Amino acid sequence: MSLKPKVSHADHILGNGQADLTIVEYGDYQCPHCGAAHPIIKEMMAELGSQIRFVFRNFPLSEMHPYARPAALAAEAAALQGKFWEMHDAIYENQNLLSARLLLDIAEQLDLDMPKFKSDIQDQELLNRVDGDFESGMLSGVNGTPTFFVNGQKFDGGAEDLVQILGEN
């Protein structure tokens, strides 16, 4: 399966925005497999970040993970204040404590404008963005998390497999 839609300026991009290698992760902030993949991806980006364009798209599996969608909204609200990746990392690093209170605590620790953050997490536009990511995942053949795409093609493997293949090339 191929990635739909293609990566654009509207995505959350880390690393080299002009890199020849693009990795897209569809993730769920409460998924334990995504949580386990997070430090592997961080290490990969520390080593190869100048050669990779890494994109994260929300794929909250809300029926199994009740805090996945609120966490996605919190990350999107933080993005409006220029702190998407900081919120993203903090959520995964505290995944075992995930709660509504934790999301507010992280926002405070990131020194976000709290009235704006609290308003933004309820904004229909952010709900639409999270839903749009989810729908794009469905169109792209995502059926679990994490799911990775390498240069637009679905990668059948986990984060460790991805790093191993990148290390070989």
Q: How should these model regions be labeled?
A:
Residues 24-25, 29-108, 167:
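Structural alpha/beta surface segment adjacent to cysteine/selenocysteine redox centers
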Residues 3, 11, 62-63, 70, ...:
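Generic detector of short alpha-helix boundary/capping microenvironments
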Residues 4-21:
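A short beta-strand-turn-helix
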Residues 3, 20, 26, 33-45, ...:
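C-terminal cap of thioredoxin/glutaredoxin-like
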Residues 13-14, 98, 155:
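Short clusters of hydrophobic/aromatic residues that line enzyme substrate/ligand-binding pockets
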Residues 10, 18, 58-62, 74, ...:
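A general structural-boundary detector
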